[in-house]
Every structure is written in structure tokens, then in C-alpha cells.
């Protein structure tokens, strides 16, 4: 059985390491990138089953990455979970609307 593929997009290397270690232990095939530009390229090339996407990143924000993913035919159906320390209702609403 093929492992489910997860694209982990997180610019904080300490957090990324914790997430990846746990996901590896659970048997997932995890690819890590640390900015929005790399995330867009990896989403098309890696074809993950799920993307764990940090909202606040350098170069391209997670919100902008999600918007691009949803408007790109090859990535529109990939499931995405946003990760963020943002706590304002407007931030949650923005992510949900994408």
C-alpha cells in the first residue's frame, strides 16, 4: 500500500521538524518546504494528498498560496489544512473563503 503524501509548508524549522517527525512515525510520506514559492512548485510536482500550510510565510503568504492552489486545475482538489498563530476572526474567515 502506498503511503499517503503530505506536503508540509512551514518556515519555522523547529516546528517543521516536530511536525515531520510525528508524521513520519505515523507512516506518511512527508515533503517539507519553507516558503510559498516552493510550496506551489512542490504541490504540482509532488502531487500530495494533503497540504499542511502555514499562513504566515516569506515570499508568498499561505493565504495567497491557497488562493493560487484553488485556481490551478492541477491542484484545485488537494486538501489543505491551514496552520497559523493568527487568532483574529477575519483571518479564519479569509482562509475559509478560499
Range-by-range predicted roles:
Residues 13-31:
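Two-component/phosphorelay signaling modules centered on CheY-like receiver
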Amino acid at each position: 500500500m502506498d503511503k499517503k503524501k503530505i506536503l508540509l509548508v512551514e518556515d519555522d524549522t523547529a516546528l517543521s521538524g516536530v511536525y515531520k517527525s510525528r508524521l513520519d512515525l505515523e507512516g506518511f510520506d512527508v515533503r517539507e518546504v519553507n516558503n510559498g514559492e516552493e510550496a506551489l512548485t512542490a504541490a504540482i510536482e509532488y502531487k500530495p494528498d494533503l497540504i499542511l500550510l502555514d499562513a504566515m510565510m516569506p515570499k508568498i503568504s499561505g493565504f495567497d498560496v491557497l488562493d493560487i492552489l484553488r485556481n490551478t486545475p492541477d491542484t484545485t482538489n488537494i486538501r489543505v489544512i491551514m496552520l497559523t498563530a493568527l487568532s483574529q476572526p477575519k483571518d479564519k474567515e479569509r482562509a475559509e473563503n478560499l
